[in-house]
Amino acid sequence: MFFFLKRIYQSSKSLQVKQCATALPEVVEENILYLVAGKQSCSSVEVPAKGVFWILGDPIGALSSPENLIKANGDIDLHTLYTELAGHYNWFWVGRDRLATGSSFGGILPVYYHHEINCVCISSSSDFLADRINAPANDRRYILERLLFHYPLFDATWYQEIKLLPAHSQLSITATHFSVRKNLDFSAYSGTPSKSHNRDLNQLAEQFVSACSDFMPVNRFGISLTGGFDGRTLVGVALKNNRSFFTYSFGASSSSDIQVPARQAKKLGLSHHSIILDENYLRNDADRSIQDFMSLSDYHGNVGRPHYLYSASILSQETSFIVTGNFGSELFRALHLPGMMMTKHLIDVFSSSDRQWKDRLWTEVKSWGQNDFDAELEGLIDDINKYLDESGMTGNARFYRFVYEELFRKYFGPEIIMQNHFLNNRTPYLNYSFVHSLNQTIWSGVHRPLFEENKFKRMIGQLFYAQVLRMSDHRLYRMKTSKGYAPNDVGESWRKPVLFYRYIQQKFNQNEALDDNNVFSVIEHFMQESKLNGIPDSGITFKGLNRDTLINWLSIAYGITKRNANHYASTTY
């Protein structure tokens, strides 16, 4: 899917909408909003005497009363929109006197924009937009944020002239100006942990089962089944609803994410696809998958995830839809360890009580950047301060505001954007109505202590998975996960000794491969082929970096080398 518009202020030409099946026309005109559906869908609904509401993407649900979306001031009521339409999509309101646009809950699918004195441009691709306006890839602040946090924190892109629309916001264009305004605050769905009884857990599980079934297509689809809780819970719901589906997983042949799902799918009588990431993949597909993944994500992704593209290309030969457990674990358990999803610097920003994180950021940046990023770091610290203070929240609630508004879209977004070129990834856990209900309970990660590390306290969210499986499929409810214990060990209080024993046994007997997806081998070969050993033209080297930092810095370096390459030639989406 793809969209583009160049809107000229005070133009005598009215705004038009043009639907395209797979590609833009050879001549792209001003004042026309081009909507390219690609593997997704494009639909519209008319609001009499007011305008037309367009949806581009893969929405789940239907608008019962579209006129209720439009507030008296012309803004879109995002609470109503997100309640009625789940899924990943971009929306466009073409009214009599304005165009407004934004994204679905979580802002996973981006809206990029560029503003000049006499016009504003919007697009789903920052690279395409940069090509149209001849924008140089010159945003050093973007580079700095990725060096520190693995992804940009706020609205920065590779290009100073192009910004990313914030999540849960609306960009409006009238005849004379444009504006960006946030329409839904975290406080609207952050909730308070007022529900804690078994009946509340049962009600939450029933709500999820009902909502989850809406995400599951009528035709055959795939479900990501791993050794953990997220995927098997989705399998349980699909079995309960007698859906036509197959399961799949990817990894090295010896990994638990291959062996456990394949073995358990067989017991359940399910067709299972094992996508093996061994020598054949490394030799024939990994490098190309890196290049394509990075290009299709506008180089906002990272080079350590080529297996997502490889698996999407294979699965697209079987189905147009997959249902995955993306976002699941993060909703229920308190995030706490540095890694690919969050760096030690991000943890420091949200956990430091004395604001000494600022000094530590300065020390870190000067250790590899000398004084080259002084101006950018000063501005970044000011913006972080403002972000921390403006919510009025503290602790884990303040951090989870960042998770919902920034982390989800920056970490999972490039993956889902890339997958859209092959198929549709439906993610039932990121559902506004469900999240709103979850955050009223003690099982939400929002209400856990900040960066809680106690393993057994962090298991509280697994009670939800256990309850869903208890009411969905008793076989899955009793099957062990790759963690060594089964959902019923968590869901039945009398089995706590069994849970403790199995957890300890797994911890001491675990012989799991350290590199399930052969990322080490992929990165080593890619570095040799690309001849990258540092950030170009900066003096910053990759020497002594841990794996996660190396992957992300290598991704930045690779993106820099590709900024002037001709990767805008294709307009097929």
What is the predicted function of each stretch?
Residues 1-225, 229-280, 289:
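Cysteine-centered catalytic environments shared across enzyme families
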Residues 6-8, 481-484:
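Generic extreme N-terminal start-of-chain segments
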Residues 97-100, 110, 175, 188-396, ...:
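ATP-dependent adenylate-handling active sites, centered on carboxylate activation for C-N bond formation
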Residues 406-407:
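Short beta-strand elements
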Residues 502-509, 513-573:
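Long, compositionally biased intrinsically disordered regions
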Residues 68-70, 74, 84-88, 483-485, ...:
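Long amphipathic alpha-helical segments
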